[in-house]
Amino acid sequence: MSNAMHVAKTGLNAQNSRMQVIANNLANVNTTGFKRDRANFESLLYQIKRASGEQTSVDTNLTSAFAVGTGVRVNNTQKVYTQGSLINTDNALDMAIDGAGFFQVLLPDGRIGFTRNGAFTRNQDGVLTTPSGYVLQPEIAIPESVTQINVSSDGIVSVQIPEQVDAQEVGQLQLADFQNRTGLQPIGENFYIETTASGPPVLENPFAAGFGKLIQGALESSNVNVIQELVDMIETQRAYEVNSKAISGSDDMLRFVNQNL
């Protein structure tokens, strides 16, 4: 395989990976709390034919290098944590974060998962959980015979119990945030886990300095912009086609050499 073919092949692989990222974004356009991904590229090693500053004669030096690149690759995929639109549901156990922060959930393996999906329900013990049954942290239990559930913007959960005049406070919701959110590891089901890159979680009540407020009876929609994703898809298709043509052009050159030399 010629060097040009190899370089173009890396371009095909990189654009294919970007297309997968775009397809995943579009697939999750209606996923509550989903944050879109972005593929970041980086160039591969360069072959230095002649270095900058290399002496070309007794009195002259090369002012710029003769360096040939060997291609491109996807360096990483990065989550874009912009705010999604808030959708009213009128469900007392639906909560949206307006601003920074993540809900904390106890995963089956004992780790803490972090999510922007605030669609909660109650299990058989009245404890707030995700629809999959993962318990919200800190654990909050709602008494069985309540007539109303209220969640304040700063995370205080209170309920109205029959035959009691005053509402009863049953828990305090807490949010987590990170110094480097892009260092979080997505694991599926709309959950992230902390890594050494993200740093440990910073825990605070909602509406504290640097944290968002809670909105009861609402959910945060995906932040995927369908039009932008379609534009990116067309751009990726064009780049893929150009790299394919580079392979075809290199093949034509090799065929010419084989047939005429």
Which ranges hold each PLM region?
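Amphipathic alpha-helical polymerization modules
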Residues: 1-261
